[in-house]
Amino acid sequence: MLSLRPYEFWFVTGSQHLYGEEALKQVEEHSMMIVNELNQDSVFPFPLVFKSVVTTPEEIRRVCLEANASEQCAGVITWMHTFSPAKMWIGGLLELRKPLLHLHTQFNRDIPWDSIDMDFMNLNQSAHGDREYGFIGARMGVARKVVVGHWEDPEVRERLAKWMRTAVAFAESRNLKVARFGDNMREVAVTEGDKVGAQIQFGWSVNGYGIGDLVQYIRDVSEQKVNELLDEYEELYDIVPAGRQEGPVRESIREQARIELGLKAFLQDGNFTAFTTTFEDLHGMKQLPGLAVQRLMAEGYGFGGEGDWKTAALVRLMKVMADGKGTSFMEDYTYHLEPGNEMILGAHMLEVCPTIAATRPRIEVHPLSIGGKEDPARLVFDGGEGAAVNASLIDLGHRFRLIVNEVDAVKPEHDMPKLPVARILWKPRPSLRDSAEAWILAGGAHHTCFSFAVTTEQLQDFAEMAGIECVVINEHTSVSSFKNELKWNEVFWRGR
């Protein structure tokens, strides 16, 4: 996985001076105990840092400004141990630019029935202190995540951890650079979009580079580096027999290794974490990048085919949310319309990430009927099984829309010996008919990011952080209600 900045999350506890210094001391001790205990749990991908118990408007505003200024702080987690009058929070929340999570918990799990007294009641007031704080968030329209439950509950911790990954993806988004090799596939609509608007909305820098720039990097790769990478291929993957001996198949694999090394060097030199290619712009290259793209995706790079820079950026961000696991560029390719067993076969010309593989990938070389170049090497495998999501980001002109479909990936019932690409089979929720109808009504693209590891909740959280629309298609979706949701959303987003 591509390395990330050493991010951290700030834990800030709200209180007030009404209860005396002894109570505030206990609030601080409890807060530190919670943070220390949470940091011992390996579920958390980044450390929590206890900042302070804040009791005045000045303290609150100061910590929010400090969070904004910190490159390490990826988000702020707030909790009201006692009652904390929420007018004190207005100045700070007006300034805060980092993702905000409101943890509605309390230090003790159970009521101490035999010993509870008013001292206990005055100290442990989260039940109404967090409601006061929640009101000001609603009154101000603050984008925030609310997680409810005892801090020792594994489900609460899991939700916190996933939100952390999403907040880090949002932080990465603000500095994300996409390299476009060539332009979009000609005459295609959905892969187009407002790159200036995307930089304003998400922080993405999206720029194009001539194929000649990449070709020079490929030519500069040493044969020693190519041979070392070929040795790595032989350790990680099955290889067709012809690819293990000198000849045209071996040379095709060698060329993909050269492309991988050159492409990676270009991306590293420019600090790019996502990129696009297109089969219509390959002048000077021997092959369309296939195996090379698959392996770079497995390292955490975002990718989009046919110049699809929005999906490339989305794949990168979902890779961050997923910690690099089980996430790939994808395309709805063809349908299986057997009554009662409708499924979608997802694939692409070459570029499906091996992190979603159920079987050991196999390097194969086959002709590619488009692009007019030599036969490219690629990894071929069947995808895994389990609950997953497909996500698409589209540009509607006046706003971006994120569309999420929950799906269930299934094991293929039949072999596909003549299909020379990586593939995965899934059943969309609530059904192929209703999901496809809703997807088309929403304008969802044919390119998506498929993930076993990212959840709908994470994608909704990201949309909230980024200030964009998000619609979800799942087992509860009815097309008639979904159509109304799209109409209501149109009014809401045009009015913002």
UniProtKB/Swiss-Prot annotation:
So what EC number does this one have?
5.3.1.4
Pathway(s) served:
Carbohydrate degradation; L-arabinose degradation via L-ribulose; D-xylulose 5-phosphate from L-arabinose (bacterial route): step 1/3
Looking up Pfam families in the UniProt record yields: AraA_central, AraA_N, Arabinose_Iso_C
Note the Gene3D superfamilies from the entry.
3.40.50.10940
Record's catalysed reaction(s): beta-L-arabinopyranose = L-ribulose
Q: Give details on activation and inhibition.
A: Inhibited by copper.
Q: What's known about how pH impacts activity here?
A: Optimum pH is 7.5-8.0.
The question of whether Metal-binding is a record keyword is answered with yes
Keyword set includes Ligase? no
Cofactor(s), by name: Mn(2+)
Keywords attached to this entry: Arabinose catabolism, Carbohydrate metabolism, Isomerase, Manganese, Metal-binding
Q: Supply one GO molecular-function term.
A: manganese ion binding
Provide the top EC class.
Answer: isomerase
**InterPro entries annotated for this entry?**
Ara_Isoase_C (IPR024664), AraA_central (IPR055390), AraA_N (IPR055389), AraA_N_sf (IPR038583), Fuc/Ara_isomerase_C (IPR004216), Fucose_isomerase_N/cen_sf (IPR009015), Lara_isomerase (IPR003762)
- A GO BP entry: L-arabinose catabolic process to xylulose 5-phosphate
Please explain the role this protein plays, according to its UniProt record.
Catalyzes the conversion of L-arabinose to L-ribulose. In vitro, converts D-galactose into D-tagatose.
User: PANTHER family attached here?
Assistant: L-ARABINOSE ISOMERASE
Tell me which family the UniProt entry assigns to this protein: Belongs to the arabinose isomerase family.
Q: How does it assemble?
A: Homotetramer.
Q: Known NCBIfam families for this protein?
A: PRK02929.1
Q: What is this protein called?
A: L-arabinose isomerase
Q: Which organism is it from?
A: Geobacillus stearothermophilus (Bacillus stearothermophilus)
Q: What is the lineage of its organism?
A: Bacteria, Bacillati, Bacillota, Bacilli, Bacillales
**What gene is behind this protein?**
araA
